[in-house]
Design a protein with these regions (language model features):
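Fold-independent oxyanion-binding glycine-rich loops
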Residues: 5, 21-23, 45-47, 75, ...
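Switch I (effector-binding) loop of TRAFAC-class P-loop GTPase G-domains
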Residues: 1-12
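Gly/Ser/Thr-rich beta-alpha loop segments that engage phosphate groups in nucleotides
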Residues: 1, 25, 52, 118, ...
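Conserved Switch II/interswitch segment of TRAFAC-class P-loop GTPases
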Residues: 14-16, 21-27, 35-85
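Alpha-helical scaffold elements adjacent to nucleotide-binding pockets in ATP/GTP-utilizing enzyme cores
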Residues: 8, 30-33, 37, 54-61, ...
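Short beta-alpha junctions and helix-cap segments that line functional grooves
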Residues: 5-6, 28-31, 54-59, 168-170, ...
Length: 207
């Protein structure tokens, strides 16, 4: 992954927003912008190979942001899978990166992304990803947003639609966003520009 990708799904009474982020330090700015948008991180680890070298950078930044991880041991269906060793390697990596006791107390999910299965144990896999989604709902804290005050939204990436124009993708930090409102955008240099919100959209799946 070079640029972040967004997705979203509804699960029960909750909405889960998912952002895939680059793993390499060469894209550090992109990584830090994305981590400022999320409330937790889901680390996929190969059931044979364990944590990859590029895992260190993103994970260390996640810990610096105070995020608590969820670990999924992926490709558990491979013949050479060694889940116990992989979890030990993950714990050792987290400890080396200075994780707090709370961050070291992470839930582990076992599964196969290709098969769409997950469970609490390598020998107890459910027929879908229900277990993983339940872990996300139960582990990830709700976003802290004050509905009072003027709208404040952090834009982390821009897209373009031929019918709508420029799309700002980000997270509302304060207030409520409505179509038709007049807003001011502020650049990194502090320059303000007046504009209007034409539409408010959210992701449905990958769209």
């Amino acid at each position: 992954t070079i640029l972040s990708k967004n997705a979203a799904l509804n699960w029960g009474e909750f909405r889960i927003n998912i952002v895939d982020t680059p793993g390499h330090s060469d894209f550090g700015g992109e990584v830090e912008r994305i981590l400022s948008m999320v409330d937790s991180v889901l680390l996929l680890v190969d059931a044979v190979e364990g944590p990859m070298p590029q895992t260190r950078y993103v994970t260390s930044k996640a810990f610096e942001n105070g995020l608590r991880p969820i670990v999924m041991v992926n490709k558990i269906d491979r013949d050479a899978s060694r889940p116990d060793w992989v979890v030990d390697q993950v714990f050792e990596l987290f400890d080396q990166l200075g994780a707090t006791e709370e961050q070291l107390d992470f839930p582990v999910v076992y599964g196969s992304a290709i098969q769409g299965i997950a469970g609490p144990d390598p020998d107890e896999l459910h027929g879908d990803l229900t277990y993983l989604l339940d872990v996300i709902v139960n582990h990830v804290p709700a976003p802290e947003v004050s509905l009072d005050g003027l709208l404040q939204m952090q834009i982390t990436s821009l897209a373009y639609d031929q019918y709508v124009g420029v799309l700002g993708v980000g997270r509302v930090k304060r207030g409520v966003i409505n179509a038709g409102e007049t807003i001011f955008t502020v650049s990194d240099e502090g320059k303000q520009k007046k504009g209007k919100i034409l539409q408010v959209m959210s992701y449905a799946g990958l769209e």
